[in-house]
């Protein structure tokens, strides 16, 4: 038998699931309205495309859940099943909310101008948002993390927030960097870009934790795997900050060019 095994007999409380679904559906509805307003004001459907992209990223959830040790009960209101794993409706809504809204907000912030330090603050804010969101959800037990999870706080393995925060940051940075390309019908290219970015960042940042989650090693090595995920995430954020962040704080004059002095 393969190890670790998900808790196949786990069941979700239907009242809690209903509340979660309604709350997230309301957030998605508001976000969609705002995305259409943004389209009307700017003439660009990019925010709407990012909302769609956020939901599309959901297709990778069964894969990352398999290697990352996450399970959703089979009695959930299931949107679809893949890799033998049921994916609930509320999770699809959560993808629209977290990845769609977060990427849009970061992209707009980059267009206004972010210093490299502020890029780091955005990453930390995204991690904090994921931590709060999942900590609240896990009190209602609509899903569970299993296996040899590193860096567990309560019911939440902290390494997940590094991955989940890096995805919208990298995606927003790519769109900002090549903003002139995503015009007209080419705005639709945001969707495959989002899918590719999600897959790449999940693998690039999450692999150290994936290894220890699915391997019975010593506790210390398990925690090292989680810390390694944070280390890789920091490298990714540093690259993003240096690529799209403003080196100097707004309003701070750039240093004058040095003049050559003749001997």
Residues of each region from the PLM?
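Aromatic-rich, lipid-facing transmembrane alpha helices and their immediate juxtamembrane interface loops
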Residues: 1-263
